Amino acid sequence: METKYDVTITAIGGLARTFLENNKSVILLDEGIRPNLSDMVVEHSGGLLAGEIKKGDKLRVGSSEYTVTSVGSDVNNNIKEEGHCTLVFNAEGSMPGQVILKGKGQPVLASGIHITFYKK
């Protein structure tokens, strides 16, 4: 397994769970980088992007695993700069900052859980 990006959830904004339930999406952002957005995002520890995230890679959120089916054109740069992307679970999307994922259900979000992109 080749780990490409691994971070730990440090805070979950009040609207972040609503976005997951209603839009099947989670907005990730480095901890403290944009305090004005903290209510809408899942903040995480800083992480190093060791390899570009690509279609076919895997994402693990806690014990839930997903397959990357599409990577927006801005995702890898945004992750390098601000730890930012939008994860879309079992839904369609086409925005440049989105990672589209397929798997069972939606992840459980909690502080301390790892979010890991990897290649098998």
Labelled PLM ranges:
Residues 1-40, 113-114:
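N-terminal disorder-to-order initiation segments that are Gly/Lys/Arg-biased
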